[in-house]
Curated annotation (Swiss-Prot):
Gene3D superfamilies per UniProt: 3.30.70.60
BP GO annotations: translation
Protein name, as recorded: Small ribosomal subunit protein bS6
NCBIfam families to which the protein is assigned, alphabetical: S6
Domain of life of the native organism: Bacteria
Molecular function terms from GO: small ribosomal subunit rRNA binding; structural constituent of ribosome
One cellular-component annotation, GO: cytosolic small ribosomal subunit
Species for this entry: Paraburkholderia xenovorans (strain LB400)
Similarity remark: Belongs to the bacterial ribosomal protein bS6 family.
InterPro entries: Ribosomal_bS6, Ribosomal_bS6_sf, Ribosomal_S6_plastid/chlpt, Transl_elong_EF1B/ribsomal_bS6
Length: 124
């Protein structure tokens, strides 16, 4: 089995359905004997360019190990899901398990937000 990194972008109006979508894709992978090494929900982010007149979308990254039939099934699911705006599947040499640079950025932004709200709460 080969290692893959999958990033898919979901319509921002469908953000509440992302956990269910991730579970569906996880069950597809594991039911065919594949493994999931990392799943990262990057949240709503600014798009580099407008897609379907949208400036923001919900990003999800998955690092998996699966066979070609499972990958074909996942790609088919992405293509025929109207909520998925774009998807990218990249073959990797080895399994990635640590946090991605994008996830580190998300965590840094969350830390800044929580640090900014704590002083205002202390004054109140």
């Amino acid at each position: 089995m080969r290692h893959y990194e999958i990033v898919f972008i979901v319509h921002p109006d469908q953000s509440e359905q992302v956990p269910a979508m991730i579970e569906r894709y996880k069950s597809t992978i594991t039911s065919h004997g594949g493994q999931i090494h990392r799943i990262e929900d990057w949240g709503r982010r600014q798009l580099a360019y407008m897609i379907e007149k949208l400036a923001k979308a919900h990003y999800v990254c998955m690092n998996i190990e699966c066979d070609q039939t499972t990958l074909d099934e996942l790609e088919h699911a992405f293509k025929f899901n109207d909520a998925v705006l774009r998807h990218l599947i990249v073959k990797m040499k080895k399994a990635e398990t640590g946090p991605s640079p994008m996830m580190k950025e998300v965590q840094r932004e969350e830390a800044k937000k929580s640090a900014a709200t704590q002083p205002s709460e202390a004054q109140a």
